[in-house]
């Protein structure tokens, strides 16, 4: 008997695998700078969503169209990949 199992088919992954890490690293001086850069932007996106109910518009929302349940870090990485943000070292 041949009992072969195939891997389940998934949609194209987004977030930490898409955009590719190698392409993201081309936009910063080191992997550590990329982590800080993406984390700060993800925090801004998260704060933007938290302030919406209060009517305060202090933070800038996502610059790319977020997916239905896409995390702020994934959105931040896609913004970095699309060169929608300016970053300077030491901020």
From Swiss-Prot:
Keyword Transcription: yes
Class of the enzyme per the UniProt entry, highest EC level: transferase
Keyword Phosphoprotein: no
SMART domains for this protein: RNA_pol_Rpb6
Recorded GO CC terms: DNA-directed RNA polymerase complex
Assembly behavior: The RNAP catalytic core consists of 2 alpha, 1 beta, 1 beta' and 1 omega subunit. When a sigma factor is associated with the core the holoenzyme is formed, which can initiate transcription.
Function (record text): Promotes RNA polymerase assembly. Latches the N- and C-terminal regions of the beta' subunit thereby facilitating its interaction with the beta and alpha subunits.
Name recorded for this polypeptide: DNA-directed RNA polymerase subunit omega
Organism per entry: Nocardia farcinica (strain IFM 10152)
Upper classification of the organism: Bacteria, Bacillati, Actinomycetota, Actinomycetes, Mycobacteriales
Gene that this sequence comes from: rpoZ
């Amino acid at each position: 008997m041949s009992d072969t199992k195939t891997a389940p088919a998934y949609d194209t992954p987004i977030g930490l695998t898409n955009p590719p890490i190698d392409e993201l690293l081309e936009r910063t001086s080191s992997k550590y700078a990329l982590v800080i850069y993406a984390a700060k932007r993800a925090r801004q996106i998260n704060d933007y969503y938290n302030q919406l109910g209060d009517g305060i518009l202090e933070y800038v929302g996502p610059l790319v169209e977020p997916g239905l349940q896409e995390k702020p870090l994934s959105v931040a990485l896609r913004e970095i990949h699309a060169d929608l943000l300016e970053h300077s070292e030491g901020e």
